[in-house]
Amino acid sequence: MAFCNTEYFDQIGNIQKIIHERERRRHELEETLFSYLRSDERLTRLKCAKMRCYAKELHEREQRAKTRNLELLGNVENLASKLKEFSIDCSRLLQKRMEYKNHITRLKKDRRKMGSRGKSEADEHPSRLSTQGLSQSAAIFMGHQTSNGSSRNDGATTKRLPSHTEQIPNHPSLPPSQSGLCMHSHVSKASGAGILSDDILNSGDFLEGRRLSDVREKQMESDWDISQRAREQQRQEELKSPHTTLKEAEVSSRSVTVNKPADIVSLEHCPTRSPSPDTTDPSDASHYMNSGGEDEEESAEDKDDSAPINQNHSDYTSNILKPDTSMHSDSDDSASQSQSGHHASRGNALIQEQSIKAMQTHCGSKHKKVSTWQSGQHHFSESPNRLSMKGFCHLLKCIEQRLETEDVVNLYRISVNEQNLSDDIISICSQRGRLDDIDLHACGAVVLQQLSMLSCSLPHGCLLPSDLINSHWSTTSKPQQIRLCLSAESAVLWDCCFTHMVQLQKQKLLSTDHIIQLFTPLLLPADATYTDKAGKLLKRLLTYKSETHYPSKSESSSSSSLPSLLNDSVEIKPARPSGTNAQTGEEQEIQSAEEDSADQSPVESIPIRETKAYQLLKQSVAQERHWSDSEEEVSEPPDAHKLEKPEVQQDILTQNNRKSVKTKPFSAVQSKAFWGESDDSNSEIEMALRPQSCNTSSHDFDDFYD
């Protein structure tokens, strides 16, 4: 009852008053705080604080920007100083250019002066010899060399070797009248400068003589280069054109014996104009023309470097190809002219006679080459470094057998340069040996080498001639169509090569494009222009072969119990075995067919009568096949039957066995699937599957499908 006294209530009332006062005080403070928060003074202070923060941040950014700008200015100044250091001073180059240009101009002027001085000295040389009584002088000119005075029978001919360094020595036994040969008016500047070196040395112009000798050496080097270039061009033209060639020694009958390189001269390059009576050694004449051509080049360079002069090279070529007809000066000028004309006519007659003989020889060799090409297979098989057709097919089969069991990478992408290994492979394949211990990359290299040789040994010079490619490259999609257009020998090589390509594609060793890029050039001539068409044709054939997938051994054995009804068109049409089935061995197919015929299942032993429509279809297919075989026999040469007889017989046996195995047991099922008849009940299937005796007469099932 202590809770009911007055003290308790007083205490409770005081506590409630205190709580009420504190609550009222809290409300007042909240109102004051809210009014302060909403006051303009506080908002102004907040804005001032934010502005101060912004101002401080801007000041810091300004300081950083100034520092960065100062750094950039310093970098720019450094770059400018480095650019000034590495800048090119073109003024020095221009100055050097002007100096060299002036130097070249001075050299040209000095050269022209030396040439004119040498010419004038050459013109003044005969008079100088007559006054001083020198015992040695010589000149090289475009004509015969005749002696002065009464000594006409003692004339001599001079010959300059290709080195152009030989000089005529002073002969002590000759008198001055005989040593000084008759000078001709047409004397070249270079020859005069080279021959008059003794006179220049005897005179006071020793320095000028040295300059002339330097010019002479440069001219000799240029002459030798041009002669080598002309001879090389002549050899190339002779290789390109089958024209008759003739040696220079056979033209001149009374020429002086001279040690000169024997060059073969083509008839089309022989000069058509008659030889002049002043004809002498062609090397000296070519040297005269070369010196004139060099003077023309100098004048052309002085005239602002105009178009180059090609007359030098052409004149030199025409003179270097001119036959040597050097003759003794046994009589006067008129006699020498008539004699030179006689030798020229005799040389022309000899050229014509040699050309007729050479043309006959060329025709005979060409005829012999054609006959050798026709019988090239016998020589081809006898060569020790070449494979025969059978040996090449054996090599491909060995490679394909090893590809099925071994993992090979980059079969035809690695070249093997061991000749002994290649010879061993060729000898083993020629003897039909095994290649289990030999590297496949070496075998691949031999395949590429021998395929090219075999293709070149065929009658058309290649496996795929141009007429075949042009007629089939856009339409043909089956390999059999290409095979029908080839000869017997070419067909064997085509089967081996195409089967090998299919195996490479099937094993995924090479892509289709790589196979085409690798084998197409080997099946065509070296200069074939239809490579793209042949590549497209091979790509279409390989694509068709990959799309028409032939089952492997396991697939064919697993599916031998019941053939697919969707492939009735392929089963009905008798065709030759494919490349993959032919590769595994046709003898195994014959044995398997005999075993299947011996061990027939109860279903296969049931004789089922075929419909008349199906029999008519089989007859039409057989007639078409007989017609195609007759066309193939007509198109092939008579000796092709000897080469292909075993293969054709084996194909016929394989086709007959396959036809008897496949079409006989399931002819009724195939005919129903072919004609689209429906089988609503299972009674006929049960009847066919029910085991019956093998001697059941066939007339019990006459109305089975009627």
Swiss-Prot record:
GO terms for cellular component: cell projection; centrosome; cytoplasm. Residues 105-184, 215-347, 571-603, 620-665, 677-706 are annotated as: Disordered. GO terms for biological process: spindle organization. Residues 128-156, 164-180, 308-320 have a biased composition (Polar residues). The keyword Coiled coil applies. InterPro entries: Centrosomal_kizuma. Residues 118-127, 215-251, 638-648 have a biased composition (Basic and acidic residues). Belongs to the kizuna family. This is Centrosomal protein kizuna. It comes from the Eukaryota. The gene is kiz. Keywords: Cell projection, Coiled coil, Cytoplasm, Cytoskeleton. Residues 63-113 form a coiled coil. It is found in: Cytoplasm, Cytoskeleton, Microtubule organizing center, Centrosome; Cytoplasm, Cytoskeleton, Cilium basal body. Residues 293-304, 586-598 have a biased composition (Acidic residues). Transmembrane segments: none annotated. Residues 272-283 have a biased composition (Low complexity).
